[in-house]
Amino acid sequence: MTRIANFVVWIVLAGLAIVFYMGITGQFRSGTVAVPSPKVIDPVGPRPPVIVGGVTVGPAGLAVPVAGVKAEQLIDTFTQSRAGGTRIHDAIDIMAPEGTPVLAAAPGKVEKLFNSEGGGGVTVYVRSPDERWSYYYAHLQGYAPGLSEGQQVRRGQLLGRVGYTGNANPQGPHLHFAINRMQPGEKWWQGSPVNPYPLLAGKGASR
């Protein structure tokens, strides 16, 4: 009797399995099975940096302007005090060995090549195509061969190399990188500072 009961149970289970299989395969053939959408993790959070052509690109489309430096290595030094608290640091410093390539963070026109011996040293000012932004690179060891004012540069293009010219400490070569929001008619030395850190690192500013 037990064998018969077990056999009946087995037949019922097998039948259910066949019905389930036929139903599922039929749904797939008819295209009625809903495929779940990929889960979105933190949809309102910042987009992480990506690698484009070997260059780290932040969520705002800006390249990290020092070759070989990853976004997670950046430190937010914007608004830190300098010179004993007499001035504010309106940029971020990206530490790197002397001679490391400095790359254009964004496309634009080289607006000014300037040597400020007591300030930024060997510097480059690049104006965005819409002229709303200025990208400032300072303390360079020197310029890339052939770089000239009025030249159009692309994102990731070599501008110069990391150094410590100007008022930088020779023991800590770095790129001083600033972004300024420009109003119509403003010149290369003007503009309103914007913190580059969250634009490059994909993180909120630390201050």
For the regions a protein language model found, what residue spans apply to each?
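A generic structural motif
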Residues: 95, 127-129, 180-182
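Acidic, glycine-rich catalytic/binding loops that coordinate metals and/or anionic ligands
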Residues: 62, 133, 145-154, 176-207
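Hydrophobic membrane-insertion alpha-helices, especially the h-region
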Residues: 6-24
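Zn2+-dependent peptidoglycan hydrolase active-site motif and core
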Residues: 105-149, 172-174
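Surface-exposed, glycine-biased beta-strand/turn segments
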Residues: 23-122, 155, 164, 193-207
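Active-site loop architecture of trypsin-fold serine endopeptidases
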Residues: 123, 162-175, 182-186
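Beta-rich strand-turn-strand
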Residues: 144-171
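N-terminal Lys/Arg-rich, disordered targeting/topogenic segments
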Residues: 1-4
